Amino acid sequence: MSILDYFRSSKKPNTASLAKERLQIIVAHQRGERGAPDYFPKMKQEIIEVIRKYVQISDDQVSVQLDQNDDNLSVLELNVTLPDSK
């Protein structure tokens, strides 16, 4: 067995496992939005608009998530992938 065969034999995910992983991500995202307050979608959009005043970004570069703990504590998590500055 050559060294090239070792690297070629790495397992590629089959379509079923890839589809399962994607479905799990979608379900987790929908569950997170289910407990969100009514104002959350509008607030999310307004936050994105404010960021766009300063940086050119697309919707897929922004992730906004609201996590609610059992202790009546809500955490708003905002992840923005900023473009490289030149």
UniProtKB/Swiss-Prot annotation:
Lineage, broadest ranks: Bacteria, Pseudomonadati, Pseudomonadota, Gammaproteobacteria, Alteromonadales
Any one GO BP annotation for this protein: cell division
Function: Prevents the cell division inhibition by proteins MinC and MinD at internal division sites while permitting inhibition at polar sites. This ensures cell division at the proper site by restricting the formation of a division septum at the midpoint of the long axis of the cell.
Keyword terms, alphabetized: Cell cycle, Cell division
Gene3D superfamilies named in the record: Cell division topological specificity factor MinE
UniProt superkingdom: Bacteria
Protein name, UniProt field: Cell division topological specificity factor
HAMAP family, sorted: MinE (MF_00262)
Sequence similarity: Belongs to the MinE family.
Organism: Shewanella frigidimarina (strain NCIMB 400)
Matching Pfam families: MinE
